[in-house]
Amino acid sequence: MPCSVEDKTGLCGSRYSVMIPELQESVIFSEDSRHYNEKQTRRQRKSSADIISTVEFNNTGELLATGDKGGRVVIFQREQENKNQPHRRGEYNVYSTFQSHEPEFDYLKSLEIEEKINKIRWLPQQNAAYFLLSTNDKTVKLWKVSERDKRPEGYNLKDEEGRIRDPCTITSLRVPVLRPMDLMVEATPRRVFSNAHTYHINSISVNSDYETYMSADDLRINLWNLEITNRSFNIVDIKPTNMEELTEVITAAEFHPHNCNTFVYSSSKGTIRLCDMRSSALCDKHSKLFEEPEDPSNRSFFSEIISSISDVKFNHSGRYIMTRDYLTVKVWDLNMENRPIETYQVHDYLRSKLCSLYENDCIFDKFECVWNGSDSVIMTGSYNNFFRMFDRNTKRDVTLEASRENSKPRAILKPRKVCVGGKRRKDEISVDSLDFSKKILHTAWHPSENIIAVAATNNLYIFQDKVN
């Protein structure tokens, strides 16, 4: 259903992109571009509040939610498929937009709390309404998104504007009725989960029982019931008695997709811990520890920084775990703890530039990674608005670029290649020419179709597979 919602964020009709994840050599992705830009982008002024900080499809893929640094959530709805226009089958339009979080100030600690949306997670749809969790650094909120196309009329004690009428002026008794109205999408906060995290929240994950979820910060992971806001259970606590002895922090956490007692969390030291809540209430002792031994020949000043895991994801079956560190994506088998079964180099050509990346703080960027619906393809972002895709079966990979400069309606996205040294071909880009201010940190893949969403700073691109 086309939405008739006022676009309060200025996210309007720019372009939208379309892509195919068949990792062929030449014609790979088509782009029916309609990416969404903020008004400031059109004037070539980028505001930090407009930078997209998270992207997430719902369980059916019909809705796509984005959060930004300004604390806003924008939800896009997929257009109904039109047989006469098959190229528009992956088109999404603005469905609802609302302010999820506001900036706050902690007077006890004299700290500002940013409104930036760190994560969004959808709950499975149970009725006509949609529910999602959004979080900033300190507070998680449960939102209900619902449609309304009727309004009540004919109140006895209220006039048409909702003002209370003088009972003395009421001369007849009316029966209220429902009248049709233009479709309106409402977002209302149903729960607010706060005051449980001392440090910044980096992850939220909904459990497979759909009754609980967990939130993770730098040193602790808490378990919540979706119906209870004033109490949570601490299930992981790695804070040492003496903070000077702190050697690592929690970077990401996720529940197993099917086993409600099992979850994993990653650390800044490059380790992944699998925990079972049935073993103890406080999961300080992990069930399994996944860690790859470091090659002494590759040891450097930056080794610990680039080994920090920025994202961890179970595959759909729950058999494998995917992790992303600064230079690589790794796939781990739950039955093999000592090394990953697959390692993919995302941008190994940056290894010689780690010193300059450290100086400009880019080495601390946190890239996410996603599976496709069948777990056969992996996607993650890079610099220069590049994103990488790896086919696990054919072992082929491709680098693609999300940018307005090379976007035309239903154009074909050509693979890009980075040249490290020597003579550069016409279609290659030198590693020295990469723009490190243009980075793709956040991506999402439709749960069942070849449709992906890519956030490039304050632009959102949506790609679908090529339509002949």
Curated annotation (Swiss-Prot):
Gene3D superfamilies: YVTN repeat-like/Quinoprotein amine dehydrogenase. InterPro entries: PP2A_PR55, PP2A_PR55_CS, WD40/YVTN_repeat-like_dom_sf, WD40_repeat_dom_sf, WD40_rpt. GO terms for cellular component: cytoskeleton; cytosol; membrane; protein phosphatase type 2A complex. The keyword Transcription regulation does not apply. SMART domains: WD40. Signal peptide: none annotated. Keywords: Cytoplasm, Cytoskeleton, Membrane, Repeat, WD repeat. GO terms for molecular function: protein phosphatase regulator activity. WD repeats lie at residues 47-86, 112-153, 196-234, 245-285, 304-342, 359-400, 435-468. It is found in: Cytoplasm; Cytoplasm, Cytoskeleton; Membrane. Belongs to the phosphatase 2A regulatory subunit B family. PP2A consists of a common heterodimeric core enzyme, composed of a 36 kDa catalytic subunit (subunit C) and a 65 kDa constant regulatory subunit (PR65 or subunit A), that associates with a variety of regulatory subunits. The B regulatory subunit might modulate substrate selectivity and catalytic activity, and might also direct the localization of the catalytic enzyme to a particular subcellular compartment. Negatively controls the initiation of oocyte maturation. This is Serine/threonine-protein phosphatase 2A 55 kDa regulatory subunit B beta isoform. It comes from Xenopus laevis (African clawed frog).
